[in-house]
Amino acid sequence: MTDKIRTLQGRVTSDKMEKSIVVAIERFVKHPIYGKFIKRTTKLHVHDENNECGIGDVVIIRECRPLSKTKSWTLVRVVEKAIL
């Protein structure tokens, strides 16, 4: 069996933890009755080994084995640094 590793792109919302960041993933969901597309956000805890991310950065993450109670994603790369 060939399992594809899940990768997602999102924006960093918190970098206060040591070697961890919180990434917000935005997706659009169609309302079942009215048909309007609604923006939904999911927050994921991500392992950042080198503490290279800051708030507002756009990053690519991939799924991995559970690293803690809430962390099961790791940082692949920073796509765009935030303008501060």
Swiss-Prot record:
InterPro entries: NA-bd_OB-fold, Ribosomal_uS17, Ribosomal_uS17_bact/chlr, Ribosomal_uS17_CS. Coiled coil: none annotated. One of its GO terms (biological process) is translation. Disulfide bonds: none annotated. The keyword Membrane does not apply. GO terms for cellular component: cytosolic small ribosomal subunit. Keywords: Ribonucleoprotein, Ribosomal protein, RNA-binding, rRNA-binding. It holds the Pfam family Ribosomal_S17. GO terms for molecular function: rRNA binding; structural constituent of ribosome. One of the primary rRNA binding proteins, it binds specifically to the 5'-end of 16S ribosomal RNA. Part of the 30S ribosomal subunit. Belongs to the universal ribosomal protein uS17 family. HAMAP family: Ribosomal_uS17_B. This is Small ribosomal subunit protein uS17. It comes from Erwinia tasmaniensis (strain DSM 17950 / CFBP 7177 / CIP 109463 / NCPPB 4357 / Et1/99). The gene is rpsQ.
